[in-house]
């Protein structure tokens, strides 16, 4: 029996993100690349994270900090909040919330919310950059608990 995919898609890992992490397939859209990159963080697959970061940004220079981030974080779940096209067909955005526990900081559940930008080059999507999004205290918590942020992950 196969394990559930860490990206929280509801699919089995071998039918979801595994083909991307093993380079048997390439992501056809930004949201799929986002899910596979999240799974790479969970699985500590730094090589995949580097391979899917836009090469113009020289991602190899981030290898050590990516490896440290993977090692020091326990990823708990991913929620895709929104997807939107960019100014051209080769640009797209994915807003997500990822829950994690940082083992070096507080040992409490944190939520990282980001609007990531992806570019397609030579028929492959790449992560290019992202902007962290603040969740308002009275907004619904991005973890999908149904509670306000201040009563949930924002405590």
UniProtKB/Swiss-Prot annotation:
<dbReference type="Pfam" id="PF02810">
    <property type="entry name" value="SEC-C"/>
</dbReference>
<protein>
    <recommendedName>
        <fullName>UPF0225 protein PC1_1977</fullName>
    </recommendedName>
</protein>
<dbReference type="Pfam" id="PF17775">
    <property type="entry name" value="YchJ_M-like"/>
</dbReference>
<dbReference type="InterPro" id="IPR032710">
    <property type="entry name" value="NTF2-like_dom_sf"/>
</dbReference>
<dbReference type="InterPro" id="IPR048469">
    <property type="entry name" value="YchJ-like_M"/>
</dbReference>
<dbReference type="InterPro" id="IPR004027">
    <property type="entry name" value="SEC_C_motif"/>
</dbReference>
<dbReference type="InterPro" id="IPR023006">
    <property type="entry name" value="UPF0225"/>
</dbReference>
<comment type="similarity">
    <text>Belongs to the UPF0225 family.</text>
</comment>
